[in-house]
């Protein structure tokens, strides 16, 4: 009886893995991957010149890497 149970379990595992292989497994939506891959760290934004470091001139919070503009200069925090 134990051998039959083990044999049935092995058969079920083999069938499920075969179904995953044929079906391509779990497919994640590409839009979600693209969205997450577009995010950059603060250092990457600064290195590529997309934001300004502290003590640089700014007009809006988005100008600063810290997202903290006092109206004239970027603040550190």
UniProtKB/Swiss-Prot annotation:
UniProt cross-references to Pfam families, sorted A to Z: Conotoxin
Covalent S-S links between cysteines: 51-65, 58-69, 64-74
Keyword Iron tagged: no
GO function terms (MF aspect): ion channel inhibitor activity; toxin activity
Coiled coil: none
InterPro entries given in the database record: Conotoxin (IPR004214)
Tissue specificity statement from the Swiss-Prot or TrEMBL entry: Expressed by the venom duct.
GO CC annotation: extracellular region
Signal peptide range in chain numbering: 1-19
Residues of the propeptide: 20-37
Keyword Secreted: yes
Compartment(s) of residence: Secreted
Domain of life: Eukaryota
Alphabetical UniProt keywords: Cleavage on pair of basic residues, Disulfide bond, Knottin, Neurotoxin, Secreted, Signal, Toxin
Description of its domains: The presence of a 'disulfide through disulfide knot' structurally defines this protein as a knottin. The cysteine framework is VI/VII (C-C-CC-C-C).
Family, per entry: Belongs to the conotoxin O2 superfamily.
Name of this chain's protein: Conotoxin VnMEKL-023
Organism encoding this protein: Conus ventricosus (Mediterranean cone)
Lineage: Eukaryota, Metazoa, Spiralia, Lophotrochozoa, Mollusca
């Amino acid at each position: 009886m134990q051998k039959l149970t083990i044999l049935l379990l092995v058969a079920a595992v083999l069938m499920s893995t075969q179904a995953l292989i044929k079906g391509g497994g779990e497919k994640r939506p590409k839009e979600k991957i693209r969205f997450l891959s577009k995010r950059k760290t603060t250092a990457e934004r600064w290195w590529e010149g997309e934001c300004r470091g502290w003590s640089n001139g700014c007009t809006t919070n988005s100008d600063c890497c810290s997202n903290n503009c006092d109206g004239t200069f970027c603040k550190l925090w």
